[in-house]
A protein has these predicted regions:
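Core transmembrane alpha-helical segments of multi-pass membrane transporters/permeases
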Residues: 1-25, 42, 46, 50-51, ...
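Membrane-interfacial loop-to-helix junctions in multi-pass transporters
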Residues: 1-5, 21, 30-46, 77-84, ...
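Hydrophobic alpha-helical transmembrane segments of multi-pass integral membrane proteins
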Residues: 11, 31-69
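Transmembrane helix-loop junctions in multipass membrane proteins, especially transporters and channels
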Residues: 20, 24, 58-61, 137-148
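Hydrophobic alpha-helical segments of integral membrane proteins
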Residues: 23-35, 66, 73, 91
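Re-entrant/interfacial helical elements at transmembrane boundaries that shape
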Residues: 27, 60-73, 102-113
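Alpha-helical transmembrane segments of multi-pass membrane proteins
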Residues: 40-53, 77-98, 119-128
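Juxtamembrane and boundary regions of transmembrane helices in multi-pass small-molecule transporters
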Residues: 76, 106-170
């Protein structure tokens, strides 16, 4: 049990370092350059979740980091926050057990005494991200922000920007 807890602590520390240094942001910017349209954005979000699961070794980081990185892009495409949340869940959560060094994979292997040979048979875990990307490209279940909601988001961003500038001056 201590081994699993130590992996979680190390993953959180590593995730913080990767976030603060901007490494994951650089990867996200590269993905965003090729993400054209709604479907490309969903695909980029899911790829970022997979990369984060593999690199940062923690499912929670695979939800939080890509969520923060892609939030504004989803808003700028006038997609409701539920769309981002679903993309994160459809790939970030459900694929974390594919990586034996990830906290979910390590916990599963320790508690259930199961090795990685089950992965080809985890059909839901493979199929769910594919269906999510399909929904992104076709627009099925992808809800949009109204113009009023988007205007409110832009006002909130500006207020946050002004507050940050004010705190720098102090």
């Amino acid at each position: 049990m201590m081994w699993t807890i130590s992996i979680i602590l190390a993953a959180m520390c590593f995730g913080g370092i990767v976030d603060v240094t901007g490494v994951m942001g650089t990867v996200a910017q590269g993905l965003l350059k090729v993400a054209k349209g709604r479907g490309g954005l969903v695909l980029a979000t899911e790829l970022m979740c997979l990369i984060t699961n593999a690199v940062c070794c923690d499912q929670y980081l695979a939800l939080v980091l890509p969520g923060r990185m892609f939030k504004e892009k989803f808003e700028d495409m006038k997609l409701r926050p539920e769309n981002l949340s679903r993309a994160l869940e459809d790939c970030g959560t459900i694929t974390s057990n594919f990586f034996p060094w990830n906290t979910c994979g390590a916990t599963m292997r320790n508690f259930l005494n199961v090795d990685s040979s089950y992965i080809p048979y985890a059909i839901l875990n493979w199929l769910n991200p594919i269906v999510s990307v399909f929904f992104g490209y076709t627009g099925i279940t992808m809800t949009k922000l109204t113009d009023e909601e988007y205007a409110a988001i832009l006002e909130e961003r500006e207020a946050e920007k002004q507050a940050a500038l004010k705190s720098l001056e102090a």
